[in-house]
């Protein structure tokens, strides 16, 4: 159905939407575990991270080198891969850990070992063990083995849920918030079959995830205004040199022409739906591309006030 939708998208938008709906419905209902995954990321994790976090054994480890990660926070199809590629294409080689899920996986592991305890209102974490575990797991990644620097990139999509823990462990964290018109983002996500993201197969679930993301970004901007930079996809594609200079300056990295010539690199690796786009030069953002979809999503726009989030 997704192939059929792609085939008719230029001539018959109505039929494209019908194919997309059938494709998403069929895929989502093909595995009962997808419902559990949706509940995890739309309800359980957000509710857990709203609780007050307390730390025991709150001393820092004695590692000589303090990592200064650059976390890229963004929804699918919001330019995260483009920003990641720009940063890693500069003169100074910044290791790229992709979507390694170190934070989330470490938290699961420590929860299973009873090093993280949770009740109705609070979370109790053994900070010393958490800190050592997360640092160790990062250094075990191939990209950071034998690395002598302090900066690296992590683009794991769900990291935004854990921003409090991230700042506790890495106080010098830099966050690049990739922003896109939320309606455009909704349509762009729905037009894809993102197999590893079960919440993307329902318009209502996509909107719920967008709201969770938006609320969290607002909190980070309030609590850590100097540690977060918002990069709008439209601005990045319309003024790539100006915006890429802002990105590199925020990351304390030197800008060069190489930053915008990433598509010529032979060692460019990407495992996301943006694989094809980043192998081409940056094209200007097309505002009119999604206008024809408004009538099909109008009830969701009105219900959730999506255009004003």
Predicted regions and their residues:
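PAPS-dependent sulfotransferases, especially Golgi type II membrane carbohydrate sulfotransferases
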Residues: 1-69, 123-125, 143-147, 186-230, ...
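Short gly/Ser/Thr-rich phosphate-binding loop of adenylate-forming enzymes
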Residues: 21, 163-166, 235
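Phosphate-binding active sites in nucleotide-utilizing proteins
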Residues: 60-170, 178-179
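Short beta-strand segments
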Residues: 72-74, 152-156, 176-179, 230-235, ...
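Aromatic-acidic/polar surface patches that form glycan- and anion
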Residues: 76, 152-159, 206, 236, ...
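Short, conserved active-site loop motifs that form the nucleotide-linked donor/cofactor pocket
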Residues: 92, 173, 228
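Conserved nucleotide-binding/hydrolysis micro-motifs of P-loop NTPases
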Residues: 101-102, 180-185, 236-237
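Conserved phosphate-donor/acceptor-positioning beta-strand/loop module used by diverse small-molecule
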Residues: 165-191, 247
């Amino acid at each position: 159905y997704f192939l059929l939708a792609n085939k008719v998208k230029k001539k018959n938008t109505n039929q494209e939407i019908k194919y997309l709906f059938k494709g998403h419905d069929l895929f989502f209902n093909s595995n009962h575990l997808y419902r559990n995954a949706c509940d995890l990321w739309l309800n359980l994790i957000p509710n857990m991270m709203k609780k007050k976090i307390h730390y025991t054994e709150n001393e820092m480890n004695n590692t000589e080198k303090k990592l200064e990660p650059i976390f890229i926070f963004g929804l699918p199809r919001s330019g995260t891969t483009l920003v990641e590629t720009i940063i890693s294409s500069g003169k100074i080689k910044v290791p790229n850990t992709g979507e390694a899920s170190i934070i989330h996986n470490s938290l699961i592991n420590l929860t299973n070992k009873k090093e993280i305890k949770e009740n109705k209102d609070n979370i109790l974490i053994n900070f010393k063990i958490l800190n050592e575990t997360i640092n160790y797991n990062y250094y075990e990644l191939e990209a950071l083995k034998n690395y002598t620097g302090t900066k690296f990139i992590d683009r794991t999509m769900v990291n935004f849920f854990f921003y409090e823990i991230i700042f506790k462990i890495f106080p010098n964290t830099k966050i690049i918030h990739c922003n896109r018109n939320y309606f455009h983002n909704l349509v762009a996500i729905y037009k894809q079959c993102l197999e590893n993201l079960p919440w993307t197969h329902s318009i209502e679930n996509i909107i719920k995830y967008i709201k969770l993301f938006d609320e969290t970004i607002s909190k980070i901007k309030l609590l850590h205004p100097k540690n977060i930079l918002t990069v709008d996809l439209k601005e990045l594609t319309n003024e790539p040199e100006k915006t890429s200079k802002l990105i590199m300056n925020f990351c304390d990295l030197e800008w060069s022409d190489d930053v915008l010539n990433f598509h010529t690199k032979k060692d460019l690796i990407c495992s996301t739906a943006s694989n094809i786009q980043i192998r081409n030069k940056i094209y200007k953002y097309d505002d009119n591309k999604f206008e024809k979809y408004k009538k099909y999503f109008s009830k969701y726009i009105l219900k959730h006030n999506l255009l004003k989030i």
